């Protein structure tokens, strides 16, 4: 395999992506494929941190009638389920993995401690961050931007169920325009569905590029090698 473009990356996985075509729960085949991709990029010297969403179990913004704070905490718990599933898949193929959660649940995961997380990465362990930031009103996209800054990751790999960023939904509009490169401000001003504005602003302030692409094993590897796939935001 070619030499990687990045030494340390943060891979952001949406919960929906983990569900596969079923749209709900965890698709073991998808999770196993992601684990294989992570192992392959780790084998060429890339340190990998992961942030997982929880949308395959819970969508807080659509929980009508529920207190927003409560809904967000339920969403955080959903991300921990996904983190544990991915950890299991990775360890089944002999990839040392640690789950760290922003909410203390020591029976199943380490508490989030920045220095410890960095040390795990340096020791070639995959670190999966669960429970978001630990605070309501913050998305897992914002978690990804925050953890990428804290881990000093060189790029956020945003693996989604679409192949790039478009000006409108390509599944609905045949004339949707595909972007290959965007600035942070364009994403914010055009309200493009990349990350929410808080996450995008955090990436802009810390000069962390974002690569958006369709979640496949091959694409994760290609993104790490710096190939022109999907959309790059910088």
Curated annotation (Swiss-Prot):
Its EC number is 2.7.4.22. InterPro entries: AceGlu_kinase-like_sf, Asp/Glu/Uridylate_kinase, Uridylate_kinase, Uridylate_kinase_bac. SUPFAM superfamilies: Carbamate kinase-like (SSF53633). One of its GO terms (cellular component) is cytoplasm. It is found in: Cytoplasm. One of its GO terms (molecular function) is UMP kinase activity. Coiled coil: none annotated. One of its GO terms (biological process) is 'de novo' CTP biosynthetic process. Pfam families: AA_kinase. Signal peptide: none annotated. UMP binds at residues 54, 72, 133-140. ATP binds at residues 12-15, 55, 59, 161, 166, 169. Pathway: Pyrimidine metabolism; CTP biosynthesis via de novo pathway; UDP from UMP (UMPK route): step 1/1. Its main location: cytoplasm. Transmembrane segments: none annotated. It is an enzyme of class 2 (transferase). Belongs to the UMP kinase family. Catalyzes the reversible phosphorylation of UMP to UDP. This is Uridylate kinase. The lineage of its organism: Bacteria, Bacillati, Bacillota, Clostridia, Peptostreptococcales.
């Amino acid at each position: 395999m070619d030499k990687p473009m990045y030494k340390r990356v943060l891979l952001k996985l949406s919960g929906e992506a983990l569900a596969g075509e079923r749209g709900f729960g965890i698709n073991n085949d998808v999770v196993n494929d992601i684990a294989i991709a992570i192992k392959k990029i780790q084998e060429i010297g890339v340190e990998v941190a992961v942030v997982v969403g929880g949308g395959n179990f819970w969508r807080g913004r659509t929980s009508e009638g529920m207190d927003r704070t409560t809904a967000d905490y339920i969403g955080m718990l959903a991300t921990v389920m996904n983190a544990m599933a991915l950890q299991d898949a990775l360890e089944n193929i002999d990839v040392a993995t640690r789950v760290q959660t922003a909410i203390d649940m020591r029976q199943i995961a380490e508490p989030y401690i920045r220095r410890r997380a960095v040390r795990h990465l340096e020791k070639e362990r995959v670190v999966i961050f669960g429970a978001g930031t630990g605070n309501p009103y913050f998305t897992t996209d914002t978690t990804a931007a925050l953890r990428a800054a804290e881990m000093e990751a060189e790029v956020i790999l945003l693996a989604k169920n679409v192949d790039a960023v478009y000006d409108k939904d390509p599944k609905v509009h045949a004339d949707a325009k595909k972007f290959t490169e965007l600035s942070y401000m364009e994403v914010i001003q055009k309200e493009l569905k990349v990350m929410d504005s808080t996450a995008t602003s955090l990436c802009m302030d810390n000069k962390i590029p974002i690569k958006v692409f369709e979640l496949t094993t091959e694409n994760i590897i290609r993104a790490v090698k710096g190939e022109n796939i999907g959309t790059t935001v910088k």
